[in-house]
Amino acid sequence: MSELKDCPLQFHDFKSVDHLKVCPRYTAVLARSEDDGIGIEELDTLQLELETLLSSASRRLRVLEAETQILTDWQDKKGDRRFLKLGRDHELGAPPKHGKPKKQKLEGKAGHGPGPGPGRPKSKNLQPKVQEYEFTDDPIDVPRIPKNDAPNRFWASVEPYCADITSEEVRTLEELLKPPEDEAEHYKIPPLGKHYSQRWAQEDLLEEQKDGARAAAVADKKKGLMGPLTELDTKDVDALPKKSEAQHEQPEDGCPFGALTQRLLQALVEENIISPMEDSPIPDMSGKESGADGASTSPRNQNKPFSVPHTKSLESRIKEELIAQGLLESEDRPAEDSEDEVLAELRKRQAELKALSAHNRTKKHDLLRLAKEEVSRQELRQRVRMADNEVMDAFRKIMAARQKKRTPTKKEKDQAWKTLKERESILKLLDG
C-alpha cells in the first residue's frame, strides 16, 4: 500500500470531445451517404473542426506519454534506492547469519559492489545505476493548435492593391506616357518589291546565260572557233530587260509585233538565243560573193526594221482571245502604289493599333490624374492622423486636470479648441 501511495502518477481524467456540439459539420458529413459528397463551401468549416479534433488527440497523446515516462523513471528510481540501501547496510557491518560464511566475502567486497549470494536482491530490482531525476508536478502544456495561415496569405496578396501610392509609382506612370522612340517604325509601309514575273524572267535569263557559257566552254575545247561569239558577261543579264523595254518603247527600231504576240510566240516556240549554234557555218565575208549579196547580210541592214502589216489588229485580236479563254485578265496588273489585299490588311491593322494606342494613352492620363489626386488625399489623411494625436493629447491633459480636481487652464482649453478646429478644416478638405 505504501508503494501505491508513493506513486507519482496523476491519473488525468480525459474529457472526450462532444462531436455534436463542437464539430456539427463533421458529424453531419459522417451521417451522409457516399453519393452526397462534400461541397466546396463546407471545406473551411471541416478544416477547422478537424484541426480541433487533432489538437484534442495530440493533447491526450502527450499526457499519456508523460505518464508513461513518469512511471518508467519512478520504477528506475525505486530500484536504485533499494540497491543503495542494501549497500549502506553492508558498509555498517551488519552481523551475518549462521551457516552462511559467504557473507564475509560480501562484506570484504562491499566497496566494489555486491557479489552473488543468498542476500542478493531479486534480479528484476537489480538494474544498472542511472542518473536520478527530480519530478515536479508541473502543469502539462496544452499543445498549440496548428496555425491557419490562409488569411495571412490572402491579406498579403491583397495588400499591394490597397497600399498607399508612392512617388516612384507616379514617376513610372509619367515615363509610360512618354512616346517611344520607335513608334514611327510601326507605321511604316515597306516598299513594294519587284513583281514575280520580272524576277522570274531575270532568273531565267541568268540560267540561260550559265547554260550558254557552259556550252561555249565545251565548244571552245572542241573547235576553238565559237568561243568569242558565244561569250556573255553576267552584266548582260541586267542589260537584256532594259534593251527589251527600249525596243518596246521604240517599235520602229525593233520588232514590230506587240508584247502579247511576242509572249505567245515565246511560249509556243522553244528557242535558246544564247547557246551556240554548232551546226551553223561562219559566213565568209571575203570574196566576190560578198559583192552582190553582202548588202542584204550586212550588220547595217540587219538593224533596219522590217515592216509587217496589221500588227496592231493582230495584237488586239490576240488579247481578246486570251481574255475570252481566261488566260489573261481584262485589267492590267495594278501599279505599285495602288491598293492590294496585303496593303489593305496592313493599313487596317495599323489603324487598329493607332486606336488602341490612343485609348491606352487616354487611360494612362486618367490613371496619372487619379494617382496625383490620391497622393494629395494621402497627405491629408496623414495630417488627420497627426491632428487626432494632438486632440488625444489635449484630451488627456484635460482629464488629468479633472482627476486632480482642478479646473483646466485657459491655455489648455485654447489648445484643445485649436486642434479641434484644425482637424475639422482638414476633414472638410478631405471630403471636398
From Swiss-Prot:
Keywords: Acetylation, Coiled coil, Isopeptide bond, Nucleus, Phosphoprotein, Transcription, Transcription regulation, Ubl conjugation. InterPro entries: Histone_AcTrfase_su3. The modification N6-acetyllysine is found at residue 418. GO terms for cellular component: nucleus; SAGA complex. One of its GO terms (molecular function) is transcription coactivator activity. The modification Phosphoserine is found at residues 280, 298. There is a cross-link at residues 21, 129 (Glycyl lysine isopeptide (Lys-Gly) (interchain with G-Cter in SUMO2)). The keyword Protein biosynthesis does not apply. Belongs to the NGG1 family. PANTHER family: TRANSCRIPTIONAL ADAPTER 3, TRANSCRIPTIONAL ADAPTER 3-RELATED. This is Transcriptional adapter 3. It comes from Pongo abelii (Sumatran orangutan). The lineage of its organism: Eukaryota, Metazoa, Chordata, Craniata, Vertebrata.
